Amino acid sequence: MWEQLYDPFGNEYVSALVALTPILFFLLALTVLKMKGILAAFLTLAVSFFVSVWAFHMPVEKAISSVLLGIGSGLWPIGYIVLMAVWLYKIAVKTGKFTIIRSSIAGISPDQRLQLLLIGFCFNAFLEGAAGFGVPIAISAALLVELGFKPLKAAALCLIANAASGAFGAIGIPVITGAQIGDLSALELSRTLMWTLPMISFLIPFLLVFLLDRMKGIKQTWPALLVVSGGYTAVQTLTMAVLGPELANILAALFSMGGLALFLRKWQPKEIYREEGAGDAGEKKAYRAADIAKAWSPFYILTAAITIWSLPAFKALFQEGGLLYQSTLLFKMPFLHQQIMKMPPIAPSAMPLDAVFKVDLLSATGTAILAAVIVTGLFSKKFSSRDAFASLKETGKELWVPIMTICFVMGFANLANFAGLSSSIGLALAKTGDLFPFVSPVLGWIGVFITGSVVSNNALFGHLQVVTGAQIGAGSDLLLAANTAGGVMAKLVSPQSIAIAAAAVGQTGKESKLFKRTVAYSLILLLIICIWTFILARLGV
């Protein structure tokens, strides 16, 4: 049994700085050294291994086991999800459905600023609410490329758009997890987030149009922007207040997407915006409603499948004692499972950490996407099973590098968690006293940057936020909300998100360029959250 050591140098700030070394190296590798994502991720993993074993005295066999668990998590479920999502997209392209999809979107508006709002913001948010785990960024970015957007720009815009919806991904799991850690109801934490996230949700559509066409774009499309921002923010806020986090994205996205489509039947900007090299807006051919519905079928089949997979009754089938429980394979990691003790104040008392590699063959989100692939293939008469498998092989060849990048990132994330590196950073930030509400979102940002997940971030730092809040007299619900909101802003730049987005638009190897496009906006949005959280704490919210 090994106990985590959070201050190996006898100075919390020095220990935190050493723990921060792998993150600083990764940032340097992408921005200054301009390494490819896979090399930057591998070297970051090597640096974190050295820091964990040498500085934080983690036994070598436990460090190796934690890395292997992380790499396994990168393959399943994350790599599986990305592979299935891109495969579905490729089938939609190869069956000719995108010609009709492009025309149907152009029929709503040929203006790329408005197409960005429909697909990059609304549809992105809808998929985030239904699936999460990289699916919305992969699908919506690929759709934008088909509509004539430049690949890296499409990926960056979808990453930035995700700031409005990332807290409520996969039926609200991040908020539900944070609430459990803080001994709150999901509705309580959701209502606290009402004070923070709707402000960001309202700003994001304006930011997206500004990035595409500067102030000219905002001036020319402000009525549509008000429909999207106002509708999305109002419904998201109302849902958070009345129903909780589960449907906050889905209802808001459906309302704003439907509202914008109806509004654009009566209003269009005087000047149509198309990016240079984007070509025309798509075929002007009038398709039958049945043809349009069939073209969009891969995505509403995907939505239906993910919705079914998210139902409590369906999930119950895979729980212990459930009919399909045996379909989930569990592997306890040697030298790691319950062999490391998380210590106070990170945990209420010394507690062993579980380390189980879970292969949920049927209940995984990737399997829901696979079901959508199968149904789509069955209804595509001119697309044989041989064509489908050839497309899968092509997808695998394209994605093996980004999936390995994700594996290395997850290896680092797991190592940072099990070695106590993340906790060391968190404890140093918690020493800021009355200023902690200002830095509380920064802790969430670091958590998501490391793990790539708002859920994992809340599980990692949620208790620390609660403990620190009790020490300084700040509400635990506000700090948990800050941890969640700050974490969402890191989804714009987390290595996992960057790798998925780059792969989805065929730009693997250009992760550093994509990172540079999003990092400034991630930090600006984080600063807004920090200032606002500090103000709310001073007001006693």
Curated annotation (Swiss-Prot):
Name of the protein: L-lactate permease
Gene Ontology molecular function terms on file: lactate transmembrane transporter activity; solute:proton symporter activity
NCBIfam families the record matches: lctP
Domain of life: Bacteria
Entry's transmembrane regions: 13-33, 38-58, 67-87, 125-145, 156-176, 192-212, 222-242, 243-263, 298-318, 359-379, 399-419, 435-455, 519-539
Membrane topology: Multi-pass membrane protein
Record's GO cellular component terms: plasma membrane
Cross-referenced PANTHER family: L-LACTATE PERMEASE
Family: Belongs to the lactate permease family.
Subcellular location: Cell membrane
InterPro entries, A to Z: Lactate_perm
Induction of expression: Strongly induced under anaerobic conditions. Activated by ResDE, Fnr and ArfM.
Known role: May play a role in L-lactate transport.
Key words of the record: Cell membrane, Membrane, Transmembrane, Transmembrane helix, Transport
